[in-house]
């Protein structure tokens, strides 16, 4: 029995060896430590459309945009002394909303991701753990997701500042710790 556990652990480590990991930035370090069932550290951004959301198209839009946000395709891990973000090969799922907003992230339900995409009737919502991004990053992600969703529905979506393209390579500033750059003495 013990050798089976060791072999399974070894296989998991070998499988994860190719995955990248990212440090939590200074602003995010506090959130994994303070998250409880009473303090979720989750925020929500929503958009209401003119017609009901098509779940299949929303899922396809999510699959198309997640590649542009590699730092969102991560799970929170505990290291020896600190938490870190590890890349995952999993694909996030858009789900129908049926629970209270801004609930604590649940590894089983959310696939380990630190965000979730929800829909209900005409509304698309994205909930993020503060350890992953701030409000600005959340708005940029939602705008990009909405633009792709509308494009897949055959609607000509607006383009311009703040609307990203799936072909765009992420800018290095998107990964950086702004606190360390601008505030650290």
What are the residue ranges of the model-derived segments?
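Non-catalytic N-terminal regions of enzymes
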Residues: 2-184
């Amino acid at each position: 029995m013990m050798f089976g556990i060791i072999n399974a652990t070894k296989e998991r480590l070998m499988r994860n060896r190719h995955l990248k990991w990212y440090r939590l930035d200074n602003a995010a370090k506090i959130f994994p430590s303070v998250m409880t069932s009473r303090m979720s550290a989750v925020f929500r951004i929503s958009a209401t459309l003119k017609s009901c959301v098509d779940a299949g198209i929303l899922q396809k839009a999510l699959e198309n945009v997640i590649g542009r946000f590699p730092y969102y395709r991560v799970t929170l891990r505990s290291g020896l002394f600190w938490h870190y973000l590890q890349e995952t090969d999993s694909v996030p799922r858009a789900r129908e909303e049926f629970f209270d907003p801004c609930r604590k992230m649940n590894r089983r339900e959310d696939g380990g991701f630190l965000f979730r995409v929800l829909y209900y009737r005409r509304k698309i919502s994205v909930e993020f753990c503060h350890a992953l991004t701030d409000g600005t990053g959340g708005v940029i992600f939602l705008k990009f997701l909405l633009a792709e969703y509308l494009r897949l529905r055959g609607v000509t979506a607006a383009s311009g500042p703040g609307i990203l393209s799936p072909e765009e390579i992420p800018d290095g500033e998107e990964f950086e710790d702004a606190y360390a750059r601008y505030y650290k003495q």
